[in-house]
Amino acid sequence: MQYPLPIARLIDNYMKLPGIGEKTATRLAFYTMDMPEDDVEDFSKSLIQVKENLHSCSICGNITESDPCEICRDANRDRSTIMVVEQPKDVMAFEEMGEYNGLYHVLHGVLSPMDGVGPEEINIKSLITRLQKQDEVKEVILALNSSPEGEATAMYLAKLIKPAGLKVTRLAAGLAVGSDIEYANSITLKRAVQGRTDL
């Protein structure tokens, strides 16, 4: 038996989310169908607002409602360091840790030639332009996930940045190989930042 078209479409849409297979998508679709109408409307409005009201900061690439973002506008941030991360969720992880007070730069991905992702497909050009314009920057912290693609991206960036005379560091060991920063606890992140090493 086939599901009615509205349920089938909802299942298909849930399956577009990462880590959601057909069984989970089906459960979510039927749960959504049983939700009070007000909750469903609020949920759908939230989805639309995320797409309409959030965009990338023109300076760092983080998600924001205003441009530049709150972090880039904050005069109390340490402007001598820029931490380069893969995704906006990594910024959130470091901010929740509460130990880092510098600036960020979000790449929105990592180099992955097998997937057709080269330097032009991620936010590298704006990082280099930013480093050329902001004289107060002394250190670039490469806080990329410890996947093979993250490591390759870190090495690529280090080769681009070092000739400018800036200190380039990498997070210390402590993050398991292949692990994502967003899943690390705050103690692990704190130790990784404090024990960062030169590249």
Swiss-Prot record:
Protein name according to UniProt: Recombination protein RecR
Organism: Lactobacillus gasseri (strain ATCC 33323 / DSM 20243 / BCRC 14619 / CIP 102991 / JCM 1131 / KCTC 3163 / NCIMB 11718 / NCTC 13722 / AM63)
Residues of the Toprim domain: 80-176
ZnF segments: C4-type: 57-72
Lineage, highest ranks first: Bacteria, Bacillati, Bacillota, Bacilli, Lactobacillales
Function comment: May play a role in DNA repair. It seems to be involved in an RecBC-independent recombinational process of DNA repair. It may act with RecF and RecO.
Gene field: recR
Similarity annotation: Belongs to the RecR family.
GO biological process annotation, one example: DNA repair
Pfam families on file: RecR_C, RecR_HhH, RecR_ZnF, Toprim_4
Cystine connections: none
InterPro entries: DNA_Rcmb_RecR, Rcmb_RecR, Rcmb_RecR_Znf, TOPRIM_dom, TOPRIM_RecR
A GO molecular function held by the record: DNA binding
Keyword terms, alphabetized: DNA damage, DNA recombination, DNA repair, Metal-binding, Zinc, Zinc-finger
Transmembrane segments: none
Mitochondrion found in the keyword field: no
Stretches assigned to coiled coil: none
